[in-house]
């Protein structure tokens, strides 16, 4: 349109069952949409956990496993359409946030329980590792010595809890190493 417009999450497209334009056309494949089943009765408790570092885990506890037969039966009883249940079972968000645990909500300490999930970035490491600028842990770079400090990422994504961020970075680093070994 030639003018700046605010994101509306392409709600007319979403309502008609189509993905947003940005997720459909993203060359870098960094934008994904997915259905998440959740227990609405747990939202208030999750937002009110006393310790900020428990907010990330509390938000994960709100989500329901779309492969669990009891969850599927309850969803059907509550009138959730079959295609939504199937969408939840195939959701890339479920896989990244719940199964692989590499995606995180932004600033959970604000207690808004955002439903936008972020994958922490891996630093471009090959040249830095070869130049000795970052530490190595065997054949892989040490995630504690990446260019973006783990503490900084944890403060943005898990209210300061570093353990889930380190686990995610190590998983992604292992995947990077594996994929590189297949092509290099």
Locations of the language-model features?
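Ferredoxin-like iron-sulfur electron-transfer modules
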Residues: 1-24, 38-41
């Amino acid at each position: 349109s030639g003018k700046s417009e605010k994101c509306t999450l392409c709600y007319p497209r979403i309502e008609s069952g189509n993905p947003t334009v940005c997720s459909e056309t993203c060359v870098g494949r960094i934008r994904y949409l997915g259905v998440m089943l959740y227990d609405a009765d747990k939202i208030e408790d999750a937002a009110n956990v006393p310790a900020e570092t428990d907010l990330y885990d509390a938000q994960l506890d709100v989500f329901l496993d779309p492969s669990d037969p009891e969850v599927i039966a309850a969803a059907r009883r509550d009138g959730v359409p079959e295609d939504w249940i199937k969408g939840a079972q195939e959701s890339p968000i479920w896989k990244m946030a719940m199964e692989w645990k590499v995606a995180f909500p932004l600033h959970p300490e604000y207690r808004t329980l955002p439903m936008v999930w972020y994958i922490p970035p891996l630093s471009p490491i090959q040249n830095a590792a070869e130049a000795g600028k970052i530490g190595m842990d065997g054949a892989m770079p040490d995630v504690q010595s990446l260019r973006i400090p783990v503490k900084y990422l944890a403060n943005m994504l898990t209210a300061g809890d570093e353990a889930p961020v380190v686990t995610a970075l190590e998983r992604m680093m292992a995947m990077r190493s594996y994929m590189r070994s297949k092509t290099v």
